[in-house]
Amino acid sequence: MKNEKRKTGIEPKVFFPPLIIVGILCWLTVRDLDAANVVINAVFSYVTNVWGWAFEWYMVVMLFGWFWLVFGPYAKKRLGNEPPEFSTASWIFMMFASCTSAAVLFWGSIEIYYYISTPPFGLEPNSTGAKELGLAYSLFHWGPLPWATYSFLSVAFAYFFFVRKMEVIRPSSTLVPLVGEKHAKGLFGTIVDNFYLVALIFAMGTSLGLATPLVTECMQWLFGIPHTLQLDAIIITCWIILNAICVACGLQKGVRIASDVRSYLSFLMLGWVFIVSGASFIMNYFTDSVGMLLMYLPRMLFYTDPIAKGGFPQGWTVFYWAWWVIYAIQMSIFLARISRGRTVRELCFGMVLGLTASTWILWTVLGSNTLLLMDKNIINIPNLIEQYGVARAIIETWAALPLSTATMWGFFILCFIATVTLVNACSYTLAMSTCREVRDGEEPPLLVRIGWSILVGIIGIVLLALGGLKPIQTAIIAGGCPLFFVNIMVTLSFIKDAKQNWKD
């Protein structure tokens, strides 16, 4: 019994440091919100202006790595000896499901407004040129380039899982080929794992901070309940309690069903928006935006704006590249696990084509709808943001559609389910990563899962208390900095080990 308790207990060296670090940062922030905002602005400015170029080069180098995998010596190598675990259709559907989070619904609905009102390349705000580039930039930030970087890491993790038969729940275990077993399991590996966990906690808290206001604004629209910070906190608390009940009562099957419902409802809601908002315009705008993307792609890839200093690449491109970096390990582990039995080329092409199609559909439909509503003066997004906040502006883009009550109910259910599954996934991932020798498929301890969901909820509330998007953007960028190096080390470790052990 003692051995079993030890086996399923927490791993102190990766449990307590992230808990203490995040706890102290939350306490300091709540203690003085104004001072915290000053620090946040300073951190954001320093990282994006001084080191933004590094994130851009990281994405470009990883893109070349994708081409090397697709056309290089490992292209036909199979990730495991078994046939593919899922059919190609199911595999692609599972990829799409991973893209339909509430945070994605947040950015997909409002991102184009920011690109048009504060455009790149010195364009006039709200001009024709700004509108032509609006969706093109969304397709750039959520298109083949970032998914290609995830492909490389997914191949790396799939190689360690299915070829080398390694149990990987933290990144340090993949670094043995690069730094040796002594360092990977010693202080160096512990530091790497703690960087990963702190960044992941902030990323998940950020996603919760984006998702919660959408649900509470829906509640205000549907039920007339005023949206306040207290309501946000109550809703987050309810999600944590619901997650605890699901885990304690063995309702994980219900959570998985909810995840499937989320995916199907996403298809339904996107189809509805596509039909009623203007299918012809959406297809024309998408086609034109692909052309604009191809025309401006070299500039977008390397745009740092050092002369004009307009701030667009720092505020958006660097932010989004940090977003992709911070979620890379967690997402790549998931994508690797569902790709057993596929070749390297299949995985790389499947991810880039399938996931790009998913994100492009989301951003095209939601972004085009927002642009149409702005052009027709149906909603005034600047006034809505100034008076009520970003979440209200997003809600109004949905409420302006025909059959508004039914549409809002659909959006409310979608956001609620998406956030329930988010909290569940957060608690599971963090508990798995901070427990001792919990194997894949096993359940980590209940109290550990509840504890992490509470901490993630607290971070979400703190970010909401700070107000605005800058704290959320800064949390992502600050967390992305250490993972920038961790991702590179995982990649190099895979290349070194594959060169030695993955021969014909």
UniProtKB/Swiss-Prot annotation:
Keywords from the named record: Antiport, Cell inner membrane, Cell membrane, Membrane, Transmembrane, Transmembrane helix, Transport
GO molecular function terms listed in the Swiss-Prot or TrEMBL record: (R)-carnitine:4-(trimethylammonio)butanoate antiporter activity
Pathway given in the UniProt record: Amine and polyamine metabolism; carnitine metabolism
GO CC terms of this entry: plasma membrane
Transmembrane segments: 10-30, 51-71, 92-112, 143-163, 195-215, 231-251, 263-283, 316-336, 347-367, 398-418, 446-466, 475-495
Coiled-coil regions listed: none
Subunit and interaction comment: Homotrimer.
Functional summary from the UniProt entry: Catalyzes the exchange of L-carnitine for gamma-butyrobetaine.
Designated name of the protein: L-carnitine/gamma-butyrobetaine antiporter
Originating species: Escherichia coli (strain ATCC 8739 / DSM 1576 / NBRC 3972 / NCIMB 8545 / WDCM 00012 / Crooks)
